[in-house]
């Protein structure tokens, strides 16, 4: 089995992690977010559904600690900000591109073979 990291523990990231767990695509999932305690809480919520949903995947959450992503076979980036009223798509993609660049640099440092 493998290790999968999901960056961003919002609705998309948490749903992605839940689907990966329910399909038993990985032995371990790391859910990472920048909001303090957010990914840890989502991971605990998902782990509490383990027996109900019939999966054995270990799910852990972390706040910005990319060292916990080390050895990941796959990394899924779902992080970014939503478009705000009055914001152009060009402004949004500029901000989200910066987020993806930072996330990618951190992932490559800890899981260079991802």
Question: What positions do the PLM features span?
Answer:
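N-terminal Rossmann-fold NAD(P) dinucleotide-binding loop
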Residues: 13-14
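Conserved NAD(P)H cofactor-binding loop of Rossmann-fold oxidoreductase domains
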Residues: 79-81
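Glycine-rich Rossmann-fold phosphate-binding loop(s) that bind the pyrophosphate
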Residues: 9-10
């Amino acid at each position: 089995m493998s290790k999968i990291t999901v960056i961003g523990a919002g609705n998309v990231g948490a749903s992605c992690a839940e689907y990966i767990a329910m399909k038993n695509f990985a032995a371990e999932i790391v859910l990472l977010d920048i909001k303090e305690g957010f990914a840890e809480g989502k991971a605990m919520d998902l782990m509490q559904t383990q027996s109900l949903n019939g999966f054995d995947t270990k799910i852990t959450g972390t706040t910005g600690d990319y060292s916990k992503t080390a050895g990941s076979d796959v990394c899924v980036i779902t992080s970014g900000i939503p478009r705000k009223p009055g914001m152009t798509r060009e402004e949004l993609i500029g901000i989200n591109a910066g987020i993806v660049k930072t996330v990618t640099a951190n992932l490559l440092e800890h899981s260079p073979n991802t």
